[in-house]
Swiss-Prot record:
PANTHER family: PROTEIN ADENYLYLTRANSFERASE SELO, MITOCHONDRIAL. Its EC number is 2.7.7.-, 2.7.7.108. Keywords: ATP-binding, Magnesium, Manganese, Metal-binding, Nucleotide-binding, Nucleotidyltransferase, Transferase. InterPro entries: SelO (IPR003846). Pfam families: SelO (PF02696). This is Protein nucleotidyltransferase YdiU. GO terms for molecular function: AMPylase activity; ATP binding; magnesium ion binding. ATP binds at residues 92, 94-95, 115, 127-128, 178, 185, 268.
Amino acid sequence: MSVTSDAAVTLHSRFARELPELAIGWQAEPAPAPRLLVLNDALATELGLDADWLRSPDGIGLLLGTDVPEGATPVAQAYAGHQFGGYVPRLGDGRALLLGELTDVHGRTRDLHLKGSGRTPFARGGDGLAVVGPMLREYIVSEAMHALGIPTTRSLAVVATGRDVWRETKQPGAVLARVASSHLRVGSFQYAYQYATAAKDDEVLRRLADHAISRHHPQAAEADNPYLALFEAVVSAQASLLAQWMLVGFIHGVMNTDNMTIAGETIDYGPCAFMDTFDPATVFSSIDHGGRYAYGNQPAVAHWNLARFAETLLPLIAEDVDTAVDLVTAALGQFPQQFDTAWSTGMRTKLGLSARVDHTTATALVNDLLVLLQQTRTDYTSAFRDLGRVARGAQPSLPFTDEWLSRWRACDPDPDVMDRVNPVYIPRNHLVEDALTAATTGDLAPLATLMTALKTPFTERAGFEAHAAPAPEDFGPYRTFCGT
C-alpha cells in the first residue's frame, strides 16, 4: 500500500480510533492489471469526489485500496454473527477493508469500504478475493434499491484486478468500492458483547453503543435511557426497511445477524434477487436449503435478529437483568405492529387507495389480491403496473378476477399515486444474468443499458420494453450464489 498526499480525498479514521478492539489495521493486496469497469459518477459527485480523478491511476489506486490518502488507516472490522441460526463468534471482514470515513457534500459521514481487496486476519479459509460477476451484481442491485427509494449501501465502482480467481471455474477478479452510512451491524454488537463479557467490563460495548448513537440515532442521546432508545430506533428502522423490501418483492437471501445494519440500510447483496411470480415461499439462494430466508419469512427473521441485538444491550440498559429484559421485550414487541403498519400503508398506496377507504376493505383487497397472484402465478411487479393502467380505463392484461376488480374500482383508485410507487423496472433476474455473463467476457454494454433503465424505475421509457417484461418461460428456475 502506498500513501499519497493528494488532496483529492480526505479519509478520517473515526471507527478505527474510537473502537480499536473491533479493528485490525490492514493493507489491500495489489492488483496486477487493474481496469475500471464501472464508476458511479453521480455518487462520486455526492461524495465530493472528482469522477475524472477517480478514473486516473491514483483514483483507481484508491478504489483498490492500494493508494490511500495520508493519514488514512484502513482496517478490517471485527464482528460475530448468527449464520442460518448458528452462532459464529468471530467473523469479521475476511475479504474487505474499511478505508475510512469521508464527509459528503451534504455534511454526512459516509464509510468508504472495499470488498474483494485480499485476505485479512478474519479470512479463515477464504482467499480474500472477489470476482467480477458478484461484485457487479451488488453494484446493480444496490443502485436499483437506491433508485427505488429503499435505504441501502451504495456502490461507487467496480475495478477488475487482472487476477484470475478460482471458484467453481477460473473467473476474473474484481474489487467493489461501496459507500454506507456505516458498517455497524448487529454482529458488531455481538462481538463487542462477548469481548465485554470475557473482560468483565462493559466499556467497549458502551463505547460502541455511543458511537452508533452519535452516527445514526443522535436523538437517543437525549432520552432518559439512551441505550434503550437506541434499540427502539433500530427496531423502527428495520421494521420500515423490511416493509420496503416486501413491497417491491426483494429477497435478501442471507439475513444473518452480521448482515443487519444499525443504520437501517440494506447491506451485503450476495444471493439476493427480486421475486418474479408471487409466492411467499420463494427462495433463490443456493445455500438456503430449508427456506429460512424465503420472501415470506423475512419479517420474522428480522424480528429474531433484533432479539439477538437486544441481548447484547442488556448490560447497558439496566443494572438489573430482569428489568433490562422487560424493557427490551416491550420494545421488541413493537416490531410486528410497526412492520404491519408500514406494509399496510405501502400496499394501500400500491393499490391507489385513499384514506377514505376503511381498513377492513383495504386489507381484504390486499389479501385477496395476493392469493390471486399466487394461484395464477402472476408476475408481482407487472401486476401492479397493469392495475395502474386499468385504473385509467384500460382492460387488464393479467388474470385479475372480475369480482376483485369490481371491489377495487369501487374504491376509486388513483393511478398517479400507484405509478409513483410501483416500478416499471426492477433488476429482472434474467437481465441481471445476461449483463453479468456479458461483463465477465468483457462486454459492458448490457450492463450500461440495464443501469439506464434502473436509474428511473417508475418512468416508462421507449425502447426499454424488454426491461419491463418478466423472464421468458425457457429461463427456467433461478438460483443465486454468494460469490464467496
